[in-house]
């Protein structure tokens, strides 16, 4: 990317009020693997970002599902909602028995108790972001929490 700091997946740029981690282009997301310690399976194509970026209130993951693949079991959460944002591709989510078609630009919010699974029923990879946060934790949304800061942006040349 133009102007980006040269970072690899093992390092992040940190400042007083930010952390920036570069996972690389979405076409490389398949290299990531989730191997939960208490589950006898692994998930290829999933990278959790919370610890990498130092987030205190949100878990987020990058995900890619190859054609013909999907989540092999239903799951739900005890207290966290999830929002899935499809970045590229097409697929389906099964939510409480209802099949929902998704495609690039789809955003799907699921309450904690929703039994869910997903699959890629297309011929191209399905890329999505998953944002997980405690249900009812956002008190003010939109711009209500924002505050204007004096001055103008001073971009480096």
Features from the language model and the residues they span:
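Conserved short histidine dyad/triad with adjacent acidic residue
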Residues: 42-48, 61-77
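Conserved hydrophobic/aromatic positions in well-ordered beta-strands
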Residues: 61-63, 84, 129
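Ligand-binding loop in jelly-roll beta-barrel domains
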Residues: 92, 112-138
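Glycine- and acidic-residue-biased ligand/ion/polar-headgroup-sensing regions
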Residues: 79-81, 85-91, 96
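A short, N-terminal "cap"/entry segment at the start of jelly-roll beta-barrel domains
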Residues: 1-58, 139-157
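Short, charged/polar surface micro-motifs in flexible loops or helix N-caps
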Residues: 54-58, 66-70, 90, 134-137
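Well-ordered beta-strand scaffold positions
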Residues: 58, 63, 98-100
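Short acidic-glycine-tyrosine-enriched beta hairpin
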Residues: 97-112
């Amino acid at each position: 990317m133009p102007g980006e700091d040269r970072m690899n997946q093992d390092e992040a740029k940190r400042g007083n009020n930010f952390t920036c981690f570069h996972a690389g282009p979405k076409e490389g997301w398949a290299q990531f693997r989730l191997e939960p310690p208490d589950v006898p399976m692994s998930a290829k194509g999933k990278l959790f970002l919370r610890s990498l970026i130092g987030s205190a209130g949100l878990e987020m993951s990058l995900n890619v599902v190859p054609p013909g693949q999907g989540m092999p079991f239903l799951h739900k959460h005890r207290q966290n909602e999830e929002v899935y944002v499809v970045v590229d591709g097409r697929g389906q989510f099964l939510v409480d028995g209802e099949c929902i078609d998704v495609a690039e630009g789809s955003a799907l919010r699921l309450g904690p108790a929703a039994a869910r699974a997903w699959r890629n029923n297309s011929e191209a990879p399905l890329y999505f972001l998953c944002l997980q946060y405690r249900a009812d934790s956002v008190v003010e949304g939109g711009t209500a929490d924002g505050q204007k800061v004096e001055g103008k942006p001073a971009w480096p040349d």
